[in-house]
Amino acid sequence: MTDNDVEIAVRKQLLAQLAQAGINIPVRAGFQSAKQGREDNFVMFFPAGENPQGWQKRSYNPQGSDAGHREAQQYETTFQVQAFITEFSGYTAKDITAVVRMIVNSLPFVEALRKQGVGVQRATAIRLPYFVNDRGDYEQNPSFDFNVTYTRTLRPETAAVTALYPDIHRI
């Protein structure tokens, strides 16, 4: 599984469940290479860290001269979620962040991602920092983190050994 696979699965499920909650708001992957200017109302998420868990697993399934070598590593990625709201149907940025946090912790979200090979761990508490925006006004920037787990795989070309001839010599 790749970073893009995980981010697409998370974004798709967030959009689906926000729509079910009656909240039609864009969900953006943060820090994209092309910026299009300021948006007023959106939810942004981005990876904040990634850690391998345990040891890398190796398995083999020989097929002819190919060893069928496969390596797998369980990873845990931390996503940070933020909401930027100027004016959105009476919701504040904290309201939207709280709804998204509830969605991340919900059974439908967890189960939908589990079916795609992504595990979801409990979201953290909401942080409430403020910053000075591009107009010189204070703006609330609530955020929280949650972790997902998934497996990355690697299939290196490894030749299979077909015969081993011991050659033992006396010393």
Residue ranges and their predicted role:
Residues 1-67, 162-165, 170-171:
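Small/polar-rich, solvent-exposed N-terminal microdomains that initiate assembly or binding
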Residues 2, 88, 92, 134:
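Conserved aromatic-histidine-acidic binding/catalytic patches
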Residues 9-13, 95, 99, 103:
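Long, highly charged amphipathic alpha-helices
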Residues 53, 89-91, 152-156:
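Residue-level signal for secondary-structure boundary sites
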Residues 64-71, 133:
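Short beta-strand/turn micro-motifs at beta-sheet edges
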Residues 71-91, 98-100, 139-150:
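Oligomerization/assembly interface segments of phage tail-like spikes and tubes
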Residues 95, 103-153:
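Acidic-leaning, charged glycine-interspersed low-complexity segments
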